[in-house]
Design a protein with these regions (language model features):
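Helical cap/lid subdomain of alpha/beta-hydrolase-fold lipid enzymes
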Residues: 25-33
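Surface-exposed cleft-lining segments at the edges of enzyme active sites
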Residues: 18-25
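Single conserved hydrophobic/aromatic residue that forms the stacking wall/gate
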Residues: 1-11
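Mobile gating loops/cap/lid regions near enzyme active sites that modulate substrate access
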Residues: 32-223
Length: 223
């Protein structure tokens, strides 16, 4: 039997674990899917723009903490760009787009539609946009526009530092050893610009690439 305090501790541990997992995987994805390609393209193209979709105003109910479990999920930006929230199935819409988020998400959606239309028509997202200027990507600061609830829309300057991320990961107590090794292994395979010859960490030597591949498939629900 676990007392209420014990249950709370267990939930907190699970929440911290999930948040850490999401943060590391998101940073790996941002590094490989945005920052690295932009750095390469910027050598011959100065008309580049980078964004991060961060909207996570889903409902938090007894059915689940959807801002945590779903958050700014891959593909969720499409209803905002198109202005068509019916792209999300009707049964899920009250959880993904609760009424209390309507004002903020419609503001964000209108802004995103302006940006995308302006890029297509003028090559500049800021044409006729009054607020929230979207600055060009510059390799010196590797800036991106955070697309979120109105009060959080801003230019951000915090590129992923591969070495620093792996250093933090090594001692992250919110993750089990095998989880840290798995994330480090995924990062090593994806950080092409930062390719290293050695395994991510010495203390991961007990896990082979085959072990980590099996763990990844299990984690991603492919086994």
């Amino acid at each position: 039997f676990v007392g209420s305090r014990g249950l709370g501790d267990v939930y907190k541990r699970q929440e911290e674990n999930l948040k850490s997992w999401i943060e590391y995987r998101s940073n790996i994805w941002r590094f490989t899917g945005a920052e690295e390609p932009l750095r390469r393209m910027s050598k011959s193209n100065q008309n580049l723009y980078s964004f991060r979709f961060d909207w996570d105003e889903e409902a938090s109910t007894i059915l689940g903490d959807y801002p945590l479990f779903l958050g700014a999920a891959h593909g969720l930006e499409i209803p905002f760009i198109s202005g068509d929230y019916s792209l999300v199935p009707a049964y899920a819409r009250p959880l993904v787009f609760p009424n209390e988020s309507k004002e903020g998400r419609e503001y964000l959606s209108n802004l995103m539609m302006q940006y995308w239309a302006n890029i297509a028509k003028y090559g500049d997202p800021n044409t006729f946009v009054q607020d929230h200027r979207w600055n060009k990507f510059r390799i010196q600061n590797q800036n991106y526009l955070r697309l979120d609830s109105p009060e959080y829309i801003q230019m951000v300057y915090d590129p992923v530092d591969a070495d620093e991320m792996l250093k933090t990961l090594e001692s992250d107590s919110t993750l089990e050893l095998k989880e840290r090794c798995l994330i480090g292994w995924i990062a090593e395979m994806n950080f092409v610009e930062e390719m290293r010859g050695d395994p991510p960490f010495d203390f991961c030597s007990e896990y082979t690439s085959v072990d980590l591949l099996k763990l990844r498939r299990l984690t991603e629900g492919r086994d």
